[in-house]
Amino acid sequence: MTGLLKRKFDQLEEDDSSSSSSSSFSSRLSLSSFPASSASPAWNSDEEGPGGQAPQSDQDSCGLQSFTPPSILKRAPRERPGHVAFNGITVYYFPRCQGFTSVPSRGGCTLGMASRHSTCRLFSLAEFTQEQVRARREKLRRRLKEEKLEMLRWKFSVAGVPESGAGVPLTADAIDDASVEEDLAVAVANGRLEEANFLQPHPPRQRRALLRASGVRRIDREEKRELQVLRQSREDCGCHCDGVCDPETCSCSLAGIKCQMDHTSFPCGCCREGCENPNGRVEFNQTRVQTHFIHTLTRLQMEQGAESLGDLESPVEDTPVEQAALSPFPPSKPPVSSELGDSSCSSDMTDSSTTLSSGSSEPPNHPAHPSLPGPSFRSGVDEDSLEQILNFSDSDLGIEEEEEEGGGVGNLDNLSCFHLADIFGTGDPGSLASWTHSQSGSSLASGILDENANLDASCFLNSGLGGLREGSLPGSSGSPEGDAVQSSSWDLSLSSCDSFELLQALPDYSLGPHYTSRRVSGSPDSLETFHPLPSFSPPRDASTCFLESLVGLSEPVTEVLAPLLESQFEDAALAPLLEPVPV
């Protein structure tokens, strides 16, 4: 049914040719789809095809589908005119006349304008703006003159001198223009020029002067009496009943309006119990108004609170990884949750602080990882990427793999003994000690330590050599001075020193023939006396080491170890960085 109606509307919109073709097509369609009956044998003979069969209805349906009349809903969009552009402003000027339309608060002779304009002017936008500024300045100048004139009159009245005895007429023309211009400049600077844009009421004398200046010769005095009656009628509201309203004498009842009470005895003097006005009574409900005010104020405060809460939740806080990437310098004490992400294999912009207690020693059968950090201690850094960085092979270092006889030294690629919690400590005092125990008691006699770990040699001196030998490295022989400083902590922080010192201190690693650590036969867990560390210096502040690493300075070497350094580093330069130690 909808399709038929749509075609009907389409036929109304089409021209004569299209409507005729559509009508012929619809008539032909009706003839072909007319049902065959026994009463019309001629039609049956005409409709039969060459094979004696009637035409199929599919042909008609195909013809109907192929016909797509244009829709009345899809019309070509009309070309809309461009945006409105103002190229000029026409100003019409009307002469003043006595209005009879407004009710001023005092006096008569209201101001109005004529029904037809007298002149008109055409301004451009810039000219009209300048004209407005000029008109406002002129209004402000006249107002300043009037203020000066009123001040002068007040001075004469205070002094007791009559205006006639002043010698000059007290008019606006008597005011000095130079003083007015000075006051005008100050007023414009203070922003009083915008005040001239608002309409200001004129006193009765000024209204009469404006009318006479506009050419009004006769001012109707009757308007003054009419305005006085209107003002009195507006002031006289409500009934004058005293407590009790008599419907026969109450002015509100006689006027057919309700009595009204805003506050006690105003405007109507009747009370609630004594009001007999048949039209009713209206009272001002202060409680209702106050309740409405409180509800409105509460609703506004709730809306403002919701908006402020939405503004606070909109900014997304940076993740620890983004904060570490944005910060140009590493924090002195990174949070526990970001210690895993702040440590790196070869990085000059990371800092890891690990506080270790040198007075604890554990048996070899102690678990290798006594305290593993939980999920809350993991940083946002992907552990797979960290493990890929840590699990470097000999081909990455450029060192050919050498197999030792007897299988004492395992494959350098086998770094299964490393754990992320051991390298990037979580602040556990026994983490490094447990790591050294697990390495000394494991089947793999030599684990691989990251050669690029930025470790400062001065951190060992902060806790003493004895604290390092006894607390950090189990089984090592210590000195009496180390017992006094076992409780101190040492910091693995940034420094200009490389990792030769820590590699020399650890038992399972060697940096060359001059740096090999010999074990005492019969006690594999105990170490002989250490060779003197080349870069040991008096303990200094970690910030000093960090600044030296930025400017590229190296840590000064003590004069006592200077001869040893020269001989050792000449041979150590030719030795590989990492050399397995046969057990």
From Swiss-Prot:
Q: Name one GO cellular component term.
A: nucleus
State where composition is biased (Pro residues): 364-373
Q: What induces it?
A: By interleukin-2.
What InterPro entries does the annotation carry?
A: CSRNP_N, Cys/Ser-rich_nuc_prot
What is this protein's tissue specificity according to the annotation? Widely expressed with highest levels in thymus and lung. Low levels detected in naive T-cells.
Extract the ranges annotated as region (Disordered): 1-79, 306-381
Gene Ontology annotations of biological process type = apoptotic process; face morphogenesis; platelet-derived growth factor receptor signaling pathway; positive regulation of transcription by RNA polymerase II; post-embryonic development; regulation of DNA-templated transcription; roof of mouth development; skeletal system morphogenesis
GO molecular-function annotation terms? DNA-binding transcription activator activity, RNA polymerase II-specific; DNA-binding transcription factor activity; sequence-specific DNA binding
Q: Which cysteines are joined by disulfide bonds?
A: none
List where in the cell it is found. Answer: Nucleus
Phenotypic effect of disruption? Mice display no obvious defects in development, hematopoiesis or T-cell function. Deletion of Csrnp1, Csrnp2 and Csrnp3 together causes partial neonatal lethality, suggesting that they have redundant functions.
Superkingdom in the source lineage? Eukaryota
Pfam families assigned to the protein according to its UniProt record, in alphabetical order: CSRNP_N
Question: Which UniProt keywords are listed?
Answer: Activator, Apoptosis, DNA-binding, Nucleus, Transcription, Transcription regulation
User: Could you tell me where the Polar residues compositional bias lies?
Assistant: 54-69
- Enumerate composition-biased segments (Low complexity): 18-41, 335-361
Family under the similarity heading = Belongs to the AXUD1 family.
Q: What does this protein do?
A: Binds to the consensus sequence 5'-AGAGTG-3' and has transcriptional activator activity. May have a tumor-suppressor function. May play a role in apoptosis.
Q: What is this protein called?
A: Cysteine/serine-rich nuclear protein 1
Tell me which species this is from: Mus musculus
Lineage, opening ranks:
Eukaryota, Metazoa, Chordata, Craniata, Vertebrata
